[in-house]
């Protein structure tokens, strides 16, 4: 049987968690018990509905597909903790997975009475009409004086207590079986045929064709063109198979693609309803799953990489290129991490290529201003580079005296802009800037990273030089294909062709340390097997923690506040796992208080590429009063703070010509978003203003002023430093935007060889880090486009040093 155990508290140390963990081990041969934590469950707030959030949907799916639920509750003020009450509220507000589900209550407490009063209240709560759980009567397991009940291994010490728990659990297994028989749905019958339905995915509509026979779901076809490649692929493959195999709608959503997963399930439900059956009956059916016996799987390799995003896959590819073995462990079902969510352009100074493009109005003035900057404002370690850069700029300006000239760039400009872009002061007055040797390594090797990617099959669009929001300068190399998936598709194919092993749904729990050297990892796979990977070196590439709001709030020293309900552009996998692993072996942290918001995110989803996302030279940002409020060419944190100061919600205004410069969209997607009311379109600015509830006169004046600034090449209001197109050709568009968490600059402290350093500044032998899990490069603010340069550069560096220092010496 399969049960879920809910830890009824979010306390870091909990005897109720210890009790469930003991039950998980003790009853492993009888049943599978999956433990669910309340740590990231938001407090219940009816006015801020989070029913569709990943964490709530995950709880709902796990409960609905289990044979029973075990709740371990402590006692707080004679009742249940607020965290437990909140999850039950969420699970009875708009969804009801506990309805009719078998529930066993256990509890541990310091008191001699155990959690008796809390259990009584919990029974009353679970019996409420909106919850309607089937709670096992009697057989209350009350563990009193819990602080002395467990031994050092977390096992119950008193045999009589274990015996009583055995009897309670045996009764619960019988009880769950009886409840399941009572809940068993009657046989279904459908009107046979193929039903065309439309569900809602993450990015828009999902047209589906569902074929039903008289009593079975026979086939599910989905038009996947609206969804982002690399993110929802696993959902499209796995969800239909599981629905058909189990003839049930009670299937688990795919981590990282939960919205799309539920969209597919809802689409089939609509077809079932059209065929004359009740889809709720199919939701009560549970897929038959055999409980795997506890097992240990051991693997030996040269280098193990934690995380299958861009940095991790790059590291694995470089290890394989060197003729060695690599194993990549990824906690989510799909590879790609945040890289598949990236816009695509990666920064690398390539003057020979860039000089074929004309300079934009304002770019030469930006260079002139930088050249005239007082050297005393530059950190000492950067001054020699700054002097050389001034010479380069002065020579360029002398040679390009005409109005436009060609686009200038150099490795030194990239380096100094990365340094200045990351120079920030936190709320405590603490100044931070990028570590010189790391920034130098990044900017010196970024172009080599582009060339290396080309060598393994990534194709770049050399007809345009692009600039992501907040990049400051046009040096973006954009791949052909869809978003960052172009990188991941190529990297995955290369790793697999070279004999690399990729294990998905295998989160790493701890690092293996032997004689002071990190020599592997311990993980758990989807079959609940313990996976031990022995390796000569470990590379952490598991990303940052922008999807972990509590962790952001814990470390934050930059933003005046980070709201509990803040959206994120990130994969839900970005919860700081690698940082936890690193600190478990003594790693130092750097810059943890600085996180980056993406100012131009979808207000509802945090999605980056909805609406019209265009180059910043074409950004026209207006607040809810129809007025510009910021230099749209500024850094991400400048844009974010300005947005927050103006009520957070704002609009990107575009015309038909600017629309043509939008990234990663199609006319069909644009039309669909207009129809859905997430993008606004009108033939006049007056009509557009009325659609979005702002003063038409204010918006019309704002656009007229902006167009004059474009003609003049100068912005006297906000000093925008680069312009391209005017807003002049109908139809006109308004894309609603709002800041969302995007990147965490802080992380494990590394040196320029990607070694992880301990709190004494010494190398942790055998441990390397690359990508967002590492700190020190971007300091207080990351330039747009630099993260991709970072992951591909330091992924290669980490692999090269891991092989040279730990693999080659062993095999030589």
Curated annotation (Swiss-Prot):
Keywords in alphabetical order: FAD, Flavoprotein, FMN, Oxidoreductase, Phosphoprotein
Binding, FAD: 311, 330, 338-339, 343-344, 577, 743, 772, 788
Protein's name in the database: Urocanate reductase
Entry's Gene Ontology molecular function annotations: FMN binding; steroid dehydrogenase activity, acting on the CH-CH group of donors
Coiled-coil segments: none
Annotated PANTHER family: FAD-DEPENDENT OXIDOREDUCTASE 2 FAD BINDING DOMAIN-CONTAINING PROTEIN, FUMARATE REDUCTASE
Gene assigned in the entry: urdA
GO annotations of cellular component type: membrane
The record's free-text note on cofactor binding: Binds 1 FAD per subunit. Binds 2 FMN per subunit, one is bound covalently and the other non-covalently.
Source organism (scientific name): Lactiplantibacillus plantarum (strain ATCC BAA-793 / NCIMB 8826 / WCFS1)
């Amino acid at each position: 049987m399969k049960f879920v155990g809910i830890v009824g508290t979010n306390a870091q140390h909990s005897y109720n968690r210890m009790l469930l963990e003991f039950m998980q081990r003790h009853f492993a041969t009888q049943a599978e018990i999956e433990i669910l934590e309340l740590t990231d469950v938001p407090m219940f707030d009816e006015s801020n509905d989070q029913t569709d959030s990943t964490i709530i949907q995950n709880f709902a799916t796990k409960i609905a597909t289990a044979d029973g639920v075990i709740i371990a509750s402590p006692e707080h003020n004679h009742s249940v903790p607020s965290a437990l009450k909140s999850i039950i509220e969420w699970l009875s507000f708009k969804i009801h997975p506990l309805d009719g589900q078998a529930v066993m209550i256990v509890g541990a407490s310091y008191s001699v009475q155990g959690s008796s009063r809390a259990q009584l209240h919990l029974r009353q709560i679970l019996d409420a009409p909106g919850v309607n759980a089937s709670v096992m009567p009697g057989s209350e397991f009350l563990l009193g004086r819990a602080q002395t009940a467990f031994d050092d291994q977390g096992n119950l010490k008193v045999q009589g207590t274990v015996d009583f728990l055995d009897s309670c659990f045996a009764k619960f297994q019988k009880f769950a079986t009886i409840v399941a028989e009572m809940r068993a749905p009657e046989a279904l019958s459908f009107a046979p045929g193929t039903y065309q339905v439309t569900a809602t995915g993450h990015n828009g509509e999902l047209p589906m064709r569902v074929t039903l026979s008289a009593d079975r779901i026979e086939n599910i076809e989905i038009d996947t063109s609206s969804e982002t490649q690399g993110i929802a692929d696993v959902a499209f493959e796995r969800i239909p198979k599981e629905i058909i195999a189990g003839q049930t709608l009670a299937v688990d959503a795919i981590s990282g693609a939960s919205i799309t997963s539920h969209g597919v399930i809802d689409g089939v439900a609509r077809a079932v309803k059209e065929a004359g059956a009740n889809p709720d009956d199919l939701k009560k059916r549970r897929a038959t799953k055999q409980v795997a016996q506890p097992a240990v799987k051991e693997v030996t390799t040269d280098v193990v990489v934690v995380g299958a995003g861009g940095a991790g896959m790059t590291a694995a590819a470089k290890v394989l290129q060197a003729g060695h073995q690599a194993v990549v462990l990824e906690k989510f079902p799909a590879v790609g991490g945040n890289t598949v969510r990236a816009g695509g352009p990666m920064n690398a100074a390539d003057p020979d290529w860039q000089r074929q493009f004309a300079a934009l109005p304002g770019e030469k003035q930006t260079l002139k201003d930088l050249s005239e900057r007082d050297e005393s404002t530059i950190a000492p370690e950067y001054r020699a580079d700054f002097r050389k850069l001034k010479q380069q700029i002065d020579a360029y300006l002398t040679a390009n005296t005409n109005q436009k000239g060609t686009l200038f760039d150099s490795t030194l400009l990239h380096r100094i802009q990365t340094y200045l872009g990351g120079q920030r002061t936190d709320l405590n007055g603490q100044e931070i800037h990028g570590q010189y040797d790391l920034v130098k390594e990044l900017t010196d090797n970024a172009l080599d990273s582009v060339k290396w990617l080309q060598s393994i099959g990534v194709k770049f669009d050399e007809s345009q030089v692009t600039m992501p929001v907040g990049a400051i300068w046009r040096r973006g190399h954009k791949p052909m294909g869809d978003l960052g998936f172009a990188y991941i598709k190529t990297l995955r194919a290369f790793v697999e062709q070279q004999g690399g092993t990729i294990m998905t749904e295998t989160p790493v729990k701890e690092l293996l340390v032997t004689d002071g050297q990190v020599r592997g990892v311990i993980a758990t796979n989807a079959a609940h097997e313990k996976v031990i990977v022995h390796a000569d070196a470990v590379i952490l590439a598991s990303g940052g923690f922008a999807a972990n709001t509590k962790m952001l709030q814990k470390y934050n020293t930059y933003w005046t506040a980070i709201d509990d309900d803040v959206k994120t552009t990130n994969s839900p996998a970005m919860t700081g796992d690698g940082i936890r692993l690193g600190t478990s072996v003594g790693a130092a942290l750097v810059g943890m208080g600085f996180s980056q918001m993406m100012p131009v995110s979808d207000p509802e989803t945090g999605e980056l590429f909805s609406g019209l996302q265009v180059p910043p030279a074409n950004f026209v940002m207006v607040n809810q009063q129809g007025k510009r409020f910021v230099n749209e060419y500024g850094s991400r944190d400048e844009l974010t703070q300005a947005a927050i100061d103006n009520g957070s919600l704002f609009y990107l205004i575009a015309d038909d010509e600017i629309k043509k410069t939008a990234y990663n969209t199609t006319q069909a997607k644009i039309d669909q978003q207009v129809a859905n009311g997430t993008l606004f379109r009108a033939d006049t600015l007056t009509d557009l203003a009325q659609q979005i509830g702002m003063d038409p006169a204010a918006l019309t004046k704002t656009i007229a002023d902006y167009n004059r600034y474009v003609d003049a090449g100068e912005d006297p209001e906000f000093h925008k430093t680069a312009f391209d197109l005017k807003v002049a050709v109908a139809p006109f568009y308004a894309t609603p935007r709002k800041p969302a968490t995007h990147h965490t600059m802080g992380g494990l402290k590394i040196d320029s060889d990607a070694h992880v350093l301990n709190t004494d500044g010494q190398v942790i032998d055998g441990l390397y880090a690359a990508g967002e899990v590492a700190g020190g490069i971007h300091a207080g603010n990351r330039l747009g486009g630099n993260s991709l340069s970072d992951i591909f550069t330091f992924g290669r560096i980490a692999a090269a040093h891991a092989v040279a220092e730990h693999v080659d010496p062993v095999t030589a």
